[in-house]
Amino acid sequence: HVAQWGTYVTAEEVSKNSARLKIRTSLQYDVEMQTEDSVQQADGTYVVFDSEIIPLIDVVLQSRLVDADGHVVGEAVSEAQLMPVAPAEMEQEIELKNPNLWSIDAPYMYKVESILKNKETGEVLDRYYTPTGIRTFRFDAQKGFILNGEQVKINGVCMHHDLGCLGAAVNTRAIERQLEILKEMGCNGIRCSHNPPAPELLDLCDRMGFIVMDETFDMWRKKKTRHDYSRYFNEWHERDLTDLIVRDRNHPSIFMWSIGNEVLEQWTDAKADTLSLAEANLVLNFGHSADMLAKDGEMSVNSLLTKKLADMVRKLDATR
């Protein structure tokens, strides 16, 4: 099956005349097993888990680009062999002529339909849909924000995850109503605060034509309140930031990531930091590699932590 948030669709070489879409898909083959320690591959047709023989599966991945009217406008087909435990990473490309570009005034949406089939039997094993939009953007020192080659003034607001008297539980129509009111007053940009937003909000921003700054943390290691996220930051920040980027990176509305809201570390002098060198290396090495980031006489722990989080984002999404 396609892994959770297992597709990553990017548009390259985009113009009004053509676009090249790159589709990265992560496939998984899940089996029930006691342990993952005794894995032995035999002759290329099966693997052995604790003496249990599990056959490998040859699959065909068909990725179809579907326009807003339901017409298939591009397709790519690839084959792979799936093995338990180890995901298969596939990369495909689709060339599209005369694409409809996503913009604030005309938020045109495509979707990628990923159809995974058993190569031998033709059985459909999974069908996965990824909404996507095709656009380019950049920042210019003189002109500001440029979307699809045109200057756009960002009229943005900070939108907290609540719905007034309705509370924080997600109500899609209530969110849509909020956005409709904001649209009427001339708003075209949303800053999520100060935590991963509801997917329903991002879907609506895609369809209604808002640009979004997607935000993760309200605090890092240093607490603002007694029971806030700082209690869990060291253990969970890598997983939580990774999940946010991988979950949300296909949304055309997102043009910027935020890795922290008014985090106390940005005002802390290096001498005032209480993290030991050993603790710093545990926190700062993404993936816990042997390479040491924090060293005596270099940047403060806070500067290194900022760099680490920014590097994580760029590694997971190089398009923003």
Outline where the language-model segments fall.
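Secreted/periplasmic carbohydrate-active enzymes, especially glycoside hydrolases
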Residues: 1-199, 204, 208-212, 240-243, ...
